Amino acid sequence: MGSGSSRSSRTLRRRRSPESLPAGPGAAALEGGTRRRVPVAAAEVPGAAAEEAPGRDPSPVAPPDGRDETLRLLDELLAESAAWGPPEPAPRRPARLRPTAVAGSAVCAEQSTEGHPGSGNVSEAPGSGRKKPERPAAISYDHSEEGLMASIEREYCR
């Protein structure tokens, strides 16, 4: 099955307004960065009548898939975008602190720290070594359940 690119490019050419015609032998050059162009008369474009008539092949002057027009438009856009300047950086949010033990984790905490010599004991006292976040988290974390999670890890990681 074909891609339909020749049909879609013909449809796009029919829908174009006179201002969007490519600069060619009968079109005026861009003046002072404006996009006004003088429309090309139909007699000056050899492939215009051939494209409109069904069953006829377009002239070899017009590309069958519109690649030249696409490349020209992309080059024009690239030239315009160079004048825009760098984009403004997005504001950054402070990182949230996450709890050390996550319920439902597939890997046992003891197994994940076996190969690390200075890792110490996995089940520390709640809140030890952690800084309080500057603002309250959207989801509150219940520190009283940490002992329960540690006992479950010990039982299932034997």
From Swiss-Prot:
Residues 19-32, 39-52 have a biased composition (Low complexity). Keywords: Cell membrane, Cell projection, Cilium, Cytoplasm, Cytoskeleton, Lipoprotein, Membrane, Myristate. It is a lipid-anchor. Expressed at high levels in the kidney and pancreas. Moderate expression seen in the skeletal muscle, liver and heart. A weak expression seen in the brain, lung, uterus, prostate, testis, small intestine and colon. The keyword Membrane applies. Coiled coil: none annotated. It comes from the Eukaryota. A lipid is attached at G2 (N-myristoyl glycine). GO terms for cellular component: ciliary membrane; cilium; cytoskeleton; cytosol. It is found in: Cell projection, Cilium membrane; Cytoplasm, Cytoskeleton, Cilium axoneme. Residues 65-75 have a biased composition (Basic and acidic residues). Interacts (when myristoylated) with UNC119 and UNC119B; interaction is required for localization to cilium. This is Cystin-1. The gene is CYS1.
